[in-house]
């Protein structure tokens, strides 16, 4: 159908009798969603709307990310490798979206932000329940974080549930054990509330996988999927820190933290340390023995 006079006619099949029927806005509950942006500044500061929407949309993406990571854990428990890889691929794209979103907030100048910062009171992104929940799902577990949510018993209970359950990485290690890899017994049952720290006893397992990718392709592919997720998560953390630095400099955070300094510390946290450490040792012994053999025969 050609377009005439820069107008597009409605096609005959398009529904226009929508009284009492499910509509786009009704399905998405847009009346509730789009009425949730309520600036507190008086008169309303123009840029507070940007600040609110930035964080609300981030929380929506975090909700999806948590949904996908929980699914990945279930798939691993069921030994469903390809289904797990699918949701991890989606998780990576969600993190990319979250990372790129900071470019919108970066258009906020320091003076614009200071124009409404006081109305935020002690509220802070540090108090994002979903962010902490995702950290726990990925293995960055810190029981101290429960204190922040004492005001929200239901949310605190949800966070505690994730704290006390195996993380995504721990379920991956249990998956490897079921398929004959020499995972130490402690990873079958331990205090799941403790954060995972780098463990040299796991390195031979991953060296074997990374040095024999044809034989262990499924395991290798899952390792790389996890590396992708952590890399993208760290890029998001880094972009967050740089955006805060750009907008407020080195002022203290609204929630009482040191601000940029506190965010910088998060960049040193890791989810899957052995998957990065193994790259240092892969092939080293092989190359060393080959080099020694060559010297002896010369």
UniProtKB/Swiss-Prot annotation:
Keywords: Dioxygenase, Heme, Iron, Metal-binding, Oxidoreductase, Tryptophan catabolism
GO terms, biological process: L-tryptophan catabolic process to acetyl-CoA; L-tryptophan catabolic process to kynurenine
Residues binding substrate: 51-55, 113, 117, 254
Pfam families named among the record's database cross-references: Trp_dioxygenase
GO MF term list: heme binding; metal ion binding; tryptophan 2,3-dioxygenase activity
Catalysed reactions listed for this entry: L-tryptophan + O2 = N-formyl-L-kynurenine
Cofactor(s) it depends on: heme
Chain residues that bind heme: 240
EC number: 1.13.11.11
Cofactor binding mode and count: Binds 1 heme group per subunit.
Superkingdom of origin organism: Bacteria
Pathway the protein acts in: Amino-acid degradation; L-tryptophan degradation via kynurenine pathway; L-kynurenine from L-tryptophan: step 1/2
InterPro entries hit by this protein: Trp/Indoleamine_2_3_dOase-like (IPR037217), Trp_2_3_dOase (IPR004981)
Function: Heme-dependent dioxygenase that catalyzes the oxidative cleavage of the L-tryptophan (L-Trp) pyrrole ring and converts L-tryptophan to N-formyl-L-kynurenine. Catalyzes the oxidative cleavage of the indole moiety.
Complexes and interactors: Homotetramer.
Protein name: Tryptophan 2,3-dioxygenase
Organism: Xanthomonas axonopodis pv. citri (strain 306)
Gene behind this protein: kynA
